[in-house]
Amino acid sequence: MALVRVSCMLALLLIAGQGQAAPVKTEGSTLGLLGGGFGGSVGLSAGIGVGGGLYSGFGGGGYPGGYASGYPGGYGGGYSGYNGYGGSGFGGGYYPGGGYSGFGHRPHHHGGYYPGGGSYHNQGGSYGGHYSQSQYSNGYYGGGGYGGGGYGGNGFFGK
């Protein structure tokens, strides 16, 4: 008799447990999906919208902080002073965008390991200064979609 009681209680607990757990799980999944969607949208708009255009020097991006002021702007972003000023800001880094690159100045101020400032994607310094003062490296795209822009950085919008 006691065994029947125990098994009945266990069955009731299992049924009750299932009834309660289902909505919580569903809600969690829904919230997770919403959160993921929102996070993805924010990442894309920060990375592509803000980072990739005229204001790329001020942009944040998909990979904020630490290791990237931009993809191959290298590891300059996290370790430089003012990432908002394009590429790697003032401080340099492994592949710094260097100096005031976001405002059209020469990219060699405060170099880094590649003291030309922009061996990658600023197209300056080590690569002979191609486009080094044009809108494609140090002007509108200074540090550009790839440096402090689309792929990361701690720009003013990336904080």
UniProtKB/Swiss-Prot annotation:
Signal peptide, first to last residue: 1-21
The entry's keywords: Cuticle, Signal
Tissue specificity statement from the Swiss-Prot or TrEMBL entry: Larval (posterior) and imaginal (anterior) epidermis.
GO molecular function annotation: structural constituent of pupal chitin-based cuticle
Biological role: Component of the pupal cuticle.
This protein's domain notes: This protein is glycine-rich and contains several repeats of the motif (G/S)1-4(Y/F) like structural proteins from insect egg shells, egg cases and vertebrate cytokeratins.
Protein name: Pupal cuticle protein Edg-91
